[in-house]
Amino acid sequence: MTEALISAALNGTQPELLAGGWAAGNATTKCSLTKTGFQFYYLPTVYILVFITGFLGNSVAIWMFVFHMRPWSGISVYMFNLALADFLYVLTLPALIFYYFNKTDWIFGDVMCKLQRFIFHVNLYGSILFLTCISVHRYTGVVHPLKSLGRLKKKNAVYVSSLVWALVVAVIAPILFYSGTGVRRNKTITCYDTTADEYLRSYFVYSMCTTVFMFCIPFIVILGCYGLIVKALIYKDLDNSPLRRKSIYLVIIVLTVFAVSYLPFHVMKTLNLRARLDFQTPQMCAFNDKVYATYQVTRGLASLNSCVDPILYFLAGDTFRRRLSRATRKSSRRSEPNVQSKSEEMTLNILTEYKQNGDTSL
């Protein structure tokens, strides 16, 4: 017992939250929750990286879409909404970074905790659906270029984007009920990334429904679109075509995001919830610890899409790279006259000072 207390103090954990433990409650007996030291360093490190790169990348993307990408194409509408979802999410990361550096002691209140988890899930499933829209848009443009001319208009993309936002907010709204804060035995405050044990059974059902309808089905649609896109690129005469290049980039980037960020997160989240519900025997505690630790890793990976998406705009967007280069050149040209005028002003001031002092050697 003494060794457990010392280990808990060194790792910033509670005795009842040590790995591999077996806790006896008033009514039930179950494996104790894992709270290992790596979580306090891995997650904030990942979130700092995502915040810096995601904030800069999505700020530039939004600036480009608003000021330099007019008039928008249909795919630009989807990409702007994707950038907006990512930008809103990265704005919430500083509070989460502090939370983990503070040994997961939440100080911002229950409402902010609910909002934090709500925005994460809105970004997660909003990004998945907007990537699906982008993929379907590219599929129709490559595989059915003539039939899709009317369907790819900007107005239709605006309608679809509005529907996506409404759908995501409606589906994710229950998170505002399930998430929240809780008080640990040592009086610190936790901000649940899923939910408290008392709501776990119903949350598992809700989580499975969102996984199927907001992840699995869009992923199947994307795989189908990309399979047909690759087939069209192979059999159609699109050599050296910008559309061919952008389509290849789109396939590679989106599939990478799903393979690295979305798929591992949903698999491990489901397994972790199932372990909390049904794998509560002494023989399963060590397995549960590994599941929980892996789930924490995938939580960090799930946030990486917010800093990867700007690469998608740059490589697969309509004229994004060319217009970004043009915008930066314009900015540099505007700064050159300012530098020159400042230099002339400094020279004039120096000459005036010398003349006032009676020095005419210049």
From Swiss-Prot:
One of its GO terms (cellular component) is plasma membrane. PROSITE patterns: G_PROTEIN_RECEP_F1_1, G_PROTEIN_RECEP_F1_2. It is found in: Cell membrane. Disulfide bonds join C31-C285, C113-C191. The keyword Ligase does not apply. It is a multi-pass membrane protein. Brain, spinal cord, gastrointestinal tract, spleen and leg muscle. Is not detected in the heart, liver, stomach, lung and kidney. Residues 1-40, 99-114, 178-203, 274-292 are extracellular. The keyword Zinc does not apply. Keywords: ATP-binding, Cell membrane, Disulfide bond, G-protein coupled receptor, Glycoprotein, Membrane, Nucleotide-binding, Receptor, Transducer, Transmembrane, Transmembrane helix. Residues 64-76, 137-155, 227-249, 315-362 are cytoplasmic. Belongs to the G-protein coupled receptor 1 family. Receptor for extracellular adenine nucleotides such as ADP. In platelets, binding to ADP leads to mobilization of intracellular calcium ions via activation of phospholipase C, a change in platelet shape, and ultimately platelet aggregation. This is P2Y purinoceptor 1. It comes from Gallus gallus (Chicken). The lineage of its organism: Eukaryota, Metazoa, Chordata, Craniata, Vertebrata. The gene is P2RY1.
